């Protein structure tokens, strides 16, 4: 089992919130290994690199553009958590241009895979008519 897979499993086993962020920050020494695996197409490593740039453990500061780059690669490889995180970033315009249409697209991909948080977020966009045509039934 490679480091990215082991760390991904450990990360996902933690409760959401500060424990996950602390884990990513404490594993910054593994970033070169993640980069090697991500470059070879490992979706879990791409997600972890995205997360590291998202929370600021990759070089000390958060880097939204790098986070989006790695989340997008992980998302395109089918990682639903990366798909959801892209939706969050685009919906909030955190460090990049806000784009609710793009947020809805990524939420939809993760929602279609059964991720409850993405289903809720997509439902909120439908309800408010942001990024999608308003549809209270959908």
Regions found by a protein language model. Name each.
Residues 1, 39-42, 55-57, 76-79, ...:
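Short helix-capping/linker turns of helical repeat alpha-solenoids
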Residues 1-52:
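N-terminal segments that cap or nucleate solenoid repeat domains
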Residues 3-4, 10-11, 30, 50, ...:
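Small-residue hotspots
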Residues 7-17, 48-55, 83-92, 121-128:
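Hydrophobic face of amphipathic alpha-helices that form TPR/SEL1-like repeat modules
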Residues 22-33, 60-70, 97-106, 133-138:
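Structural signature of tandem alpha-helical TPR/SEL1-like repeats
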Residues 35-37, 73-74, 109-110:
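Canonical positions in the second alpha-helix
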């Amino acid at each position: 089992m490679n480091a990215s897979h082991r760390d991904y499993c450990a990360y996902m086993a933690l409760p959401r919130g500060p424990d996950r962020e602390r884990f990513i920050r404490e594993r910054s020494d593994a970033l070169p290994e993640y980069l090697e695996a991500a470059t070879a197409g490992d979706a879990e490593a791409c997600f972890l690199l995205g997360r590291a740039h998202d929370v600021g453990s990759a070089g000390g500061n958060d880097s939204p553009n790098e986070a989006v780059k790695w989340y997008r690669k992980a998302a395109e490889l089918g990682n639903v958590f990366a798909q959801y995180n892209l939706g969050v970033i685009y919906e909030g315009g955190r460090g990049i241009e806000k784009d609710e249409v793009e947020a809805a697209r990524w939420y939809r991909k993760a929602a279609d895979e059964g991720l409850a948080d993405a289903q809720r977020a997509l439902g909120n966009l439908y309800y408010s008519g942001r990024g999608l045509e308003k549809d209270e039934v959908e």
